[in-house]
Curated annotation (Swiss-Prot):
Protein name per UniProt: Aldehyde-alcohol dehydrogenase
InterPro entries, A to Z: AAD_C, ADH_Fe/GldA, ADH_Fe_C, ADH_Fe_CS, Alcohol_dehydrogenase_Fe, Ald_DH/histidinol_DH, Ald_DH_C, Ald_DH_N
Active site: residue positions: 257 (nucleophile)
Sites where the protein binds NAD(+): 438-443
Reaction equations catalysed: ethanol + NAD(+) = acetaldehyde + NADH + H(+); an aldehyde + NAD(+) + H2O = a carboxylate + NADH + 2 H(+)
Amino acid sequence: MADKKTVTPEEKKLVAEKHVDELVQKALVALEEMRKLDQEQVDYIVAKASVAALDAHGELALHAFEETGRGVFEDKATKNLFACEHVVNNMRHTKTVGVIEEDDVTGLTLIAEPVGVVCGITPTTNPTSTAIFKSLISLKTRNPIVFAFHPSAQESSAHAARIVRDAAIAAGAPENCVQWITQPSMEATSALMNHEGVATILATGGNAMVKAAYSCGKPALGVGAGNVPAYVEKSANIRQAAHDIVMSKSFDNGMVCASEQAVIIDKEIYDEFVAEFKSYHTYFVNKKEKALLEEFCFGVKANSKNCAGAKLNADIVGKPATWIAEQAGFTVPEGTNILAAECKEVGENEPLTREKLSPVIAVLKSESREDGITKARQMVEFNGLGHSAAIHTADEELTKEFGKAVKAIRVICNSPSTFGGIGDVYNAFLPSLTLGCGSYGRNSVGDNVSAINLLNIKKVGRRRNNMQWMKLPSKTYFERDSIQYLQKCRDVERVMIVTDHAMVELGFLDRIIEQLDLRRNKVVYQIFADVEPDPDITTVNRGTEIMRAFKPDTIIALGGGSPMDAAKVMWLFYEQPEVDFRDLVQKFMDIRKRAFKFPLLGKKTKFIAIPTTSGTGSEVTPFAVISDKANNRKYPIADYSLTPTVAIVDPALVLTVPGFVAADTGMDVLTHATEAYVSQMASDYTDGLALQAIKLVFENLESSVKNADFHSREKMHNASTIAGMAFANAFLGISHSMAHKIGAQFHTIHGRTNAILLPYVIRYNGTRPAKTATWPKYNYYRADEKYQDIARMLGLPASTPEEGVESYAKAVYELGERIGIQMNFRDQGIDEKEWKEHSRKLAFLAYEDQCSPANPRLPMVDHMQEIIEDAYYGYKERPGRRK
């Protein structure tokens, strides 16, 4: 008789790979067929398949019990019921086909697609229920599944899969929607997991199998081992806790991975709990029996030299307590449900504190709450990271403390952990037989695995404009002598006036105090008159300290931009002392989504802004510019919480402003209005304000500077506030970005700096760019057209956008010259060499400035450096090139 041919490992591997490839190719065909199913068809298939499995739940449980020789028939039947009933009920109304969600407000549409062919790995512990579960969630998501069953449960697992498959096909599913490897082997399982046609791996099994799944270079939904503690704290319902733990631990002879592996009992209730535990046929082993149990279960004894090398004896998994005791070498009463072993600590020295997957449980005494939590934490971290932990207590706060302490995804409160872990019976966890352990357990999923995990959710995002706004002071008073409002303002008793020395010397401070003294109630006031031009953060801090000591209910900021800006930040520091200045100055793309959220102001004080120059518009804006002179930095701070409560725009306060000051501040107004009009955040609400402000400037600034008549001064005062209203909501651009940095370095006058830069910025922004700005509402470049609008309004040549840009830039330059401004930086007393040495740094700093993001074209550092260098000589001598 000829010798039987020996199959080599390589031949065995090739056979396995061929078989697997045939299965996967069939599954790929099924995938295309399943893509054609609609939601109604899918739900019908799942319903029919689940009913078929439900009808055979007892038959399948018996098959699994007989084939594996493990667990409890009745409990396996319950697990099959759970997979058919709870899982399907939970996903009954889940949309898994096509458009599953549509939101007209956000513009998002979600579309569900199958992930592809699923590789399903199942364990010997829950063979039929896991096969049912994975088949049903795959069908629900239109994914064909190919199983690699555990060899010791091959037939019962295939039996379960066959019932689901046949029912699904009868209901309209494609022929190969559910398949399995018929000749199980490690080679076949490896080939399936690594097959390029497999999209994802759904693995339930031992750590080695899960690790292998994650090593395949494709998405894997693998779950880790558990080592679940149950901490019974002294306030717990002892009868309930003992009942739950016994029921949970004995369920299917402890084979559910979420079952308790140790019970930790507070010393105050230890004896009472143990007595209750014993009443449910739990047998506590003695010292000798414990040693025998350790040796049989793990091959080592407690505190022996080789404890670290303990390995679970796979023969005990799912076996009855009586059988385990007998095999270990001792006898227990008939009907014993659980073997309990008292242990002194958690860890390698006590092998019975490891995961056992059998009706064997470690029992530990806790000396305190802290000790109980520590022991529970140690259990989870002893080869059970991320899985589950249970606590029995009446203390809700302790439950939260416990949840924070243990590295477990599932914290199960006052419930049996077997059913608490798999969900939907004792709590609202997702019903599942595959329990993710998150990053703690080196898993990609940190929840109970469900149908959602087998979907690719595509998002269709419709373009939408960001919601914009119009935020201004709640009240703005104007016209001559409108400071009389101070007599009538409500709830004014303690007033801090923030101003500068000029306001004191010119008598403006006295006029404010006079109005306060005319009130019916007596007003106590504190004066801080030390604000300097370009106020420094140290000045702000000094004013804040005085404010904290005085405790005002009203702040009045009197003066130009400097007192108003300083007062705003004092207001912020006074009401919110914990705020860090460094947080305030951070740049943002969208003021509503900034990394640092400004706190709301106005709880302690109201803020009244009274401008005495016509330039900054700070009385109506959410901005403040604060210097850090020690580091030559100037920071524009922006947040709507800084918007004054009330603005009083009284033209009588600007009649004595010197002409050169009116010139500088007037050009600042023009820059505000121009930059707001072309800003990418400009809107219909701000455009009208900006255009009116520009019109008022060109009609009145020259007369305001040269004649100082009431009419022109009033119009310029109004223009300043109107421009402020516009740029408070549309923001500014790079003229201000560069002006802030130049002013900080060379201490130039802010309005004059803007006047010199503005013609350059108009030409720069008016040139169609290569790199455009980013803002949804700004859907195409149009700054050149908006400059053309301005030129037309002013009656300038503007037959084309290019002509309008050039006309307007020239008009701005000529206006500056007419009012006496030397329109270059050379004539501001700045050394040419020093200017050029700093130009690069100033350009970088300007790019970082908060005004840059709203510029209508993306500002490039090289371009701003060129503008800065050209502006030294002035627009007339070196107008710069259009970039």
